Design a protein with these regions (language model features):
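P-loop NTP-binding core
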Residues: 1-267
Length: 267
């Protein structure tokens, strides 16, 4: 959309880094060096010193597996929660949007990201434990309010891979195969087997669970999006490109475009 965007990857798994086409194992300064800058005895590395351009036009502050080793040191920093916020101060006026990617596990990187953020988007998958993650996050939000005085209210939830493993929300050739549809008009399909009947019952039960989970999530977030499972997402990741550049008209790409439109209304 022509906006200048920075992605700050604070997850040691470095999926955002790899997803934007940068090899996480490549040499060079990364977020480990930025976080360690606040520790006595380590060299000063500003966030601007590690930012790299990516093929999509998005700027990236890359992560590295070494970032795992930085977390124990953060507890000894003068203000552990504000290390990232202080680092962002040098570059935030250069960008329209800065996205902070945090790990899925609890710790200083998540708290640093939440403290630095103006808005919070919670990403969930459609698995059975999605609501457990929401409950845990609510506890973190309350702790940050009590300890730091900052109230955090998530603006949006994104449920990804919606319908994975079932026909719901899944892009398949079967849905668009005109020959198959015509064939079934003139030929009665065979009676389903016992296994097919059982599979259909299990699929229905899973869809009911998904809808019940989604209803609970909608109660807790002002805005909720479900991103359908799409092979295009994984192809985009392998090529190091955002879905908006690789397959914007895919089922997932259309939803992410709607998400981007809403996010742009926040400022």
């Amino acid at each position: 959309m022509g906006r200048k965007v920075l992605v700050v990857d604070c997850d040691p798994q470095a999926n955002a880094t790899a997803g934007l086409g940068i090899d996480p194992s490549a040499s060079g300064k990364n977020m480990y060096d930025v976080f360690m800058s606040g520790i006595d005895g380590f060299p000063r590395v500003a966030l601007g010193d590690i930012i790299r351009k990516t093929a999509s036009g998005i700027d990236l502050a890359p992560s590295h597996l070494d970032l795992v080793g930085a977390e124990p040191y953060l507890y000894h920093a003068a203000f552990p929660t504000g290390v990232l916020n202080e680092a962002l101060a040098d570059v935030k006026n250069q960008y329209s949007y800065i996205f902070i990617d945090t790990p899925p596990s609890l710790g200083q990187f998540v708290i640093n990201g939440l403290y630095a953020a103006d808005h919070v988007i919670v990403t969930l998958d459609s698995g059975s434990f999605a609501l457990n993650g929401v409950t845990t996050l609510s506890t973190i939000f309350a702790d940050i309010k009590n300890d730091l005085g900052k109230e955090i209210r998530p603006d949006m939830a994104i449920v990804s891979r919606w319908g994975e493993g079932s026909r719901q929300g899944c892009e398949t050739e079967e849905r668009t195969d005109l020959f198959t549809r015509i064939f079934h008009i003139f030929h009665k399909p065979p009676e389903p087997s016992v296994k097919e009947i059982q599979d259909a019952k299990e699929q229905k039960k899973e869809q009911e669970r998904l809808l019940a989970t989604l209803a609970e999530i909608r109660k807790r977030f002002p805005s909720v999006y479900t991103v359908p499972y799409s092979p295009a997402v994984y192809e985009a990741q392998k090529r190091g490109m955002p879905i908006s550049h690789f397959a914007p008209d895919s089922s997932a790409g259309v939803v992410y475009k709607a998400i981007a439109d809403e996010v742009m209304k926040w400022t």
